[in-house]
Amino acid sequence: MQRRGFLKWLVSCLAVINGLILGIPFIGTLLSSAATRGKAAWSRVGAVDRLPLGVPVEVRFQSSGTEAYFHRSDLNSVWIIMHSRGDATVFSPVCTHLGCHFTWNQQHGRFECPCHASVFALDGTVLYGPAPRRLDTLPAKIEKGVLYVEYERFQVGTPEKKVI
Ligand code: FES
């Protein structure tokens, strides 16, 4: 092999090695990001024995997940109704009309949104107002007395529940 040919071969080999060193982690990140996109992680909300039965309570908790290349940690809240120590309904705190946070009115036994006066029953159905669909439930599970939630965000202002 001529000296010039050897140098070309050597430079090509170094370029391939350099490409692998830089490219493999990048491709791995893209693949893992694509695999987890749109899938929320389970977040620990708290012990169920501290929650009252049959009465909605708003609970704040820290949720975490990966979006694109970034690990994020957010402070979120959910509305929880414990039907028993092993069964709960968890609502997103976001009104399905335009995204305000609603509250529970204990006196009237209903959820009320302060922005445009949508009113929801204890089971989340719309009683009055412009909300186009019932309150959004979140996936929840109870393991060893601890409630976990998959915190997701949904499109507002539409009759269909769509994760965003
Ligand atoms: S945002 Fe709740 S009623 Fe409009």
Which positions does each model-derived feature cover?
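Beta-strand-rich cores of mature extracytoplasmic or soluble domains
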Residues: Q106-R110, L122-T125, G129, E143, ...
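Short cysteine/histidine-rich metal-coordination sites, predominantly Zn2+-binding motifs
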Residues: G109-A117, L127-D136
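Flexible, glycine-rich terminal cap/loop adjacent to redox cofactors
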Residues: C100, A117-F120
